[in-house]
């Protein structure tokens, strides 16, 4: 690719669109094909399902036992995804959508961080590397907390990078939110 072609690839929303397309291909392909195989994934799905059935979005349970081991946010996201998608509570793929979305957000955060600290090409390479890493692809297909934790961590690091580069009040406020 010529230098001009590379530069046009790195301008505007093209890098974000490319990374979004890559993530959609990697994270959404097969999301409904494989049933839950990880015991933790089944527990997260069941607890979110029970939350929807009971209408109690505060006291999380797995069967009869309270499930206070993980932050409640992932259960809320999974339950919201099932509700928004309008699927039967026993269909497993909507429970996985928050993980796929979180992995995508982490990729975009890494792109932005690389772009701010170095240049657009570094950001695109870093985002692509994260998007295609085996563990991220796997976690994007599983209804657990790992992808959401990755997104929260990379977003907070990106906000700190923004503060490092800009050193203004708005960047400070944004960084403090994370």
Predicted segments, located by residue:
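Membrane-integral, polyisoprenol-dependent glycosyltransferases
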Residues: 2-178
